[in-house]
Amino acid sequence: MLINDNIYYEDNHYIIINNIPNNIYYYFDYDKRDASVNMEFQHLHPYYEILFLLAPNATHLIEGVPYNIHMGDFVLLAPSVMHKSVYYKGDPSRRLIIDFMYPLDKPESSDAYKEILSPFHADNPVYRFSFQDQQKLIDILNNLFIFSKEHKYYGNPADEFYIHNKFQEFLYTLYELKDRNTYSNDQSYNSIEQKIYEVSSYIHTHYDEDISLEFLSEQFFISTSYLSREFKQVTGFNLSNYIQLTRIKNAQYQLVSSNKKISAIAQECGFSSFSQFNRIFNKISGTSPREYRQSAVIGK
């Protein structure tokens, strides 16, 4: 089917490439979501991700900051960035999710990838373009959609190579258009909501430090009781729990994406003692850090 007469879409359509020898991975997911599947807390992963919204609007929470997004917006997420989508009640929201991973350490391509992926590391993670510029990107996505429907590409080196090269054309086009981004966050907050989102953003960038309710109260010139009450009201989380969840989510990421010692990860994620880290990790994850790492290795 066509959405807005210009975007090819089909429920539960996937484009998957898992080229293990060359460390190239793609996962295109055309599907719809509604409010019933909204995540409780933000998550993160070791690959790049693009959300292309095909519904009227939604919210994307990135490192504790909510971004209001509209149909045709692209949300670009670098590895290890904490985020979650918030879909609204009513009709399910169509969207395209693209996850991908490249071998970024190869000398012959590392500089090129660093440059072409720079939009994923910009301060503004949401991209909105004019109809003409947006159509340049949609044309490439439509080409990939049609190709995946007409070819038995999986496991065919030539077909997978075509998809890989076509998507790099998409990334380069996005890179060329990055300075024409017209997005501005039209999410409206009252003054206390704005302050609370500043606090949550601070937590995401300073979770490795010694932060607490008392510290944040002084940092943002808010009384502890007021901050505690309003933080829970705005985010749905107790402030101390939010800090611990942010630390544990980052610890989980490091456990499966690095070979660091568990004690080093605990320290880097802001825990004052290893026993405290173990206790909180078990409480949130339902397993020990060591078992969490082992299960991730077995599942690969």
In which residue ranges do the predicted regions lie?
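Ligand-binding loop in jelly-roll beta-barrel domains
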Residues: 80-105, 110
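Aromatic/histidine-rich interaction motifs
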Residues: 112-142
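Short, Lys/Arg-enriched, Trp-marked, Pro/Gly-tolerant hinge/linker segments that flank
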Residues: 123-135, 151-201, 205, 209, ...
